Swiss-Prot record:
Glycans are attached at residues 38, 230, 304, 329, 401, 489, 540. One of its GO terms (molecular function) is beta-galactosidase activity. It is found in: Secreted, Extracellular space, Apoplast. It catalyses: Hydrolysis of terminal non-reducing beta-D-galactose residues in beta-D-galactosides. Disulfide bonds: none annotated. SUPFAM superfamilies: (Trans)glycosidases (SSF51445), Galactose-binding domain-like (SSF49785). This is Beta-galactosidase 8. Residues 1-20 form the signal peptide. PROSITE patterns: GLYCOSYL_HYDROL_F35 (PS01182). It comes from Oryza sativa subsp. japonica (Rice). Belongs to the glycosyl hydrolase 35 family. One of its GO terms (cellular component) is apoplast. GO terms for biological process: galactose catabolic process. Its main location: secreted.
Length: 673
């Protein structure tokens, strides 16, 4: 027998084995199925209990995604739940972002690699203590005004466009396609907002168009009749999950849940089991007892119910993306902290060596039999110590340098920040009025959210604008302005801060800036000039120190309160005149010797007032120790570097008199108390 004949015989012998292997592989792929039957979740033919937790990719630096997921897995979780914020992925119309913090596909694939399942909450509304509930703020500029979270045709067309980009990206990652996604949530707690079922039906139609019929769609609503009646759509075969206070008896609520699911399709699921709670500025930090939280979870898991911890790991509201809440009216406004620690078992900086993590971990093991993995190592943190800062410039000195001339606008009436294209941060409004001999009364009936008011003489005045006071959304809307005895008109400067858009409730259409007329002694001011304050290039702020070496004439060109006919005194005189009540930029530096010395740290702002901070051009968020409770901002190690590290601070009022900050190891939520 020749060599070729032997090879043919070998192929004949191996062919049945190859066919069998292919068949087995195909069968295995086909068996990848997740569904609900007999009021039980099933995965690949076996009953399955969801032990999940929310871990939001957009609240964690991407370098830490794997670390946080591993800590969630060591807690005993088999499933990760996350929102998808539209405003991060489409910050401008048709401008799509899916890199870095927004690389959701990489995050989902990473969960899959770690053998974790995913429940994906695609919105379009997410709530989540996130700016505008995840909606892009440019939606607020559309005319005629659209109605969010409704069957408004313009709104639906934009949702369709957004999902037409997002859903094809996640379709290959569905469980039936070999990926980790077992469930996809539409909307979020809609039953506590409205009852537009046509809107919900449309969302289901779009989701099915891109994701097919095999994926389990679900809704989440509060465990009360009214919420479930308004927010569920069982006729579309959409699974209804519930959330409720951890102090509640879960099983009567799970029984109510059955009434809003098809018969046999109501596996008990709390899709938001609250491990802690949110905190607003001016409140004490919210905490919950570890033992009582663990007991509440045990009541669900030990009776084969399913639960998703909200949050398993909270993370951080970096940048300007924190949300806010309102009460009985839109003036009853409270903004969320930069920290989204949430008193979750995995702390903001990843710590798991705490009572809550250990208590929940024991309960999960006891009730489900999920093996206990080795407890993750402690997170290394560093105290880099005291850092001296120097004042770089007053905002008024450099407004023309950090305000895009093409975006400066003139209008008879003040324009909203959104209409100015300034979606986040700050906007400076300027106008003039004729002064009386006595003081005047300034009135701004509607400002969102916080305005600092300054005045100066329009001509012949080389001094900085004089600080008058604050007008806040939640308090008095009037200010008394003292007489300046000007020979000319008085220039009025109003710096407005967008502190975060409302993310929940009836006042979610939350435009920012001055949203009413402005009056002086009952007379409406007109002829406004608006300067968007761009903080995108704070890394170049040191260059603004060149202003200090400019000639008087050059300085007059860049000063908002100078005119070309007036010679200003050397700007350095003002930059070194000491501590004053004005918005200004400060800069500090600290050195890290090597890559191995890079550690997580916190910047303590005790002694400072209110503002926003950047580390190596990364916006680590807002600080407001004057009212607390958060004193220190989290700085994850990946944004640091060996060598020189630069901290830029935009302080709205006055800095620590010693012009120092401190880099410390631990978080601190004791300010303002």
């Amino acid at each position: 027998m020749g060599p070729s004949r032997s090879f043919q015989n070998l192929l004949l012998l191996l062919l049945p084995l190859a066919l069998a292997l292919c068949s087995a592989a195909a069968s295995g792929e086909a068996s990848r199925r997740f569904w609900v039957e007999n009021d039980t979740f099933w995965k690949d033919g076996a009953p399955f209990q969801i032990v999940g937790g929310d871990v939001h990719y957009f609240r964690i630096v991407p370098e830490y995604w794997k670390d946080r997921l591993l800590r969630a897995k060591a807690l005993g979780l088999n499933t990760i739940q996350t929102y998808v914020p539209w405003n991060l992925h489409e910050p401008k119309p048709l401008s799509w972002e899916f890199k870095g913090f927004t690389d959701i596909e990489s995050y989902l694939r990473l969960a899959h690699e770690l053998d974790m399942l995913v429940m994906l909450r695609v919105g379009p509304y997410i709530c989540g203590e996130w700016d505008l509930g995840g909606f892009p703020p440019w939606l607020l500029t559309i005319e005629p005004t659209i109605e969010l979270r409704s069957s408004d045709s313009t709104y639906l067309s934009l949702v369709d466009r957004w999902w037409g980009v997002l859903l094809p990206k996640i379709a290959p990652l569905l469980y039936s396609n070999g990926g980790p996604i077992i469930m996809v949530q539409i909307e979020n707690e809609f039953g506590s907002f409205g009852d537009d079922k046509n809107y919900l039906h449309y969302l289901v139609e779009v989701a099915r168009r891109y994701l097919g019929n095999d994926i389990m769609l679900y809704t989440t609503d509060g465990g009360a009749i009214g919420n479930l009646k308004n927010g569920t759509i069982l006729q579309d075969d959409v699974f209804a999950a519930v959330d409720f206070d951890t102090g509640s008896n879960p099983w009567p609520i799970f029984q109510l849940q059955k009434e809003y699911n098809l018969p046999g399709k109501s596996a008990p699921l709390s899709s938001e089991f609250y491990t802690g709670w949110l905190t607003h500025w001016g409140e004490r930090i919210a905490t919950t007892d570890a033992s009582s939280t663990a007991k509440a979870l045990k009541r669900i898991l030990c009776r084969n119910g399913s639960a998703v911890l909200y949050m398993a790991h909270g993370g951080t509201n970096f940048g300007f993306y924190n949300g806010a809440n309102t009460g009985q009216n839109e003036s009853d406004y409270k903004a969320d902290l930069t920290s989204y620690d949430y008193d979750a078992p995995i702390r903001e900086y990843g710590d798991v060596h705490n009572a809550k993590y250990k208590a929940l971990r024991r309960v999960i093991h006891e009730c489900t039999g999920i093996p206990l993995l080795q407890l993750p190592s402690k997170i290394e943190r560093a105290s880099y110590g005291l850092v001296e800062v120097q004042k770089v410039a007053s905002l008024f000195d450099v407004i023309h340098n950090i305000s895009d001339a093409l975006k400066v606008a003139f209008s008879e009436q003040p324009l909203s920040m959104e209409l100015m294209g300034q979606m986040f941060g700050f906007l400076l409004y300027t106008s003039e009025y004729q002064e009386k001999h006595s003081s005047s009364i300034l009135s701004i009936p509607k400002v969102h959210d916080r305005a600092q008011v300054f005045v100066s003489c329009s001509h012949g005045d080389v001094r900085k604008p004089r600080y008058v006071g604050i007008v806040e959304r939640w308090s008095s809307k009037t200010l008394q302005i003292p007489s300046l005895s000007c020979s000319s008109n008085v220039s009025l400067y109003i710096l407005v801060e967008n502190m975060g858009r409302v993310n929940y409730g009836p006042y979610i259409f939350d435009q920012k800036g001055i949203l009413s007329s402005v009056e002086i002694d009952g007379i409406i001011l007109r002829h406004w000039k608006m300067h968007p304050v761009s903080l995108n290039a704070v890394g170049n702020l040191s260059k603004l120190q060149l202003i200090m070496q400019m000639t008087d004439a050059e300085a007059s060109k860049v000063s908002i309160y100078g005119d070309s006919e007036n010679k200003l005194q050397d700007v350095s005189l003002y930059l070194n005149e000491g501590i004053s009540e004005e918005p200004a930029f400060y800069e500090g530096h600290f050195h890290i010797d090597s890559e191995s010395e890079k550690k997580d740290t916190f910047i303590s702002f005790r002694g400072w007032n209110k503002g926003v901070a950047f580390v190596n051009n990364f916006n680590i968020g807002r600080f407001w120790p004057a009212i607390g409770p958060q004193c220190a901002l989290y700085v994850p190690a990946p944004i640091l570097k060996p060598g020189d590290n630069v901290i830029v601070i935009f302080e709205l009022h006055s800095p620590n008199p010693e012009l120092t900050i401190k880099l410390v190891k631990d978080p601190d939520f004791t300010c303002g108390q």
